Amino acid sequence: CYRPPVC
C-alpha cells in the first residue's frame, strides 16, 4: 500500500 489507504 501507499501513504493513502489504497492497496
Curated annotation (Swiss-Prot):
Location(s) in or outside the cell: Secreted
Q: This protein's superkingdom?
A: Eukaryota
Disulfide connectivity?
Answer: 1-7
Keyword check for Protein transport: no
What is a single cellular component term in the Gene Ontology annotation?
extracellular region
Family, according to the entry, reads as follows:
Belongs to the O2 superfamily. Contryphan family.
Q: What is this protein called?
A: Contryphan Li834
> Which organism was this protein described from?
Conus lividus
Native organism taxonomy: Eukaryota, Metazoa, Spiralia, Lophotrochozoa, Mollusca
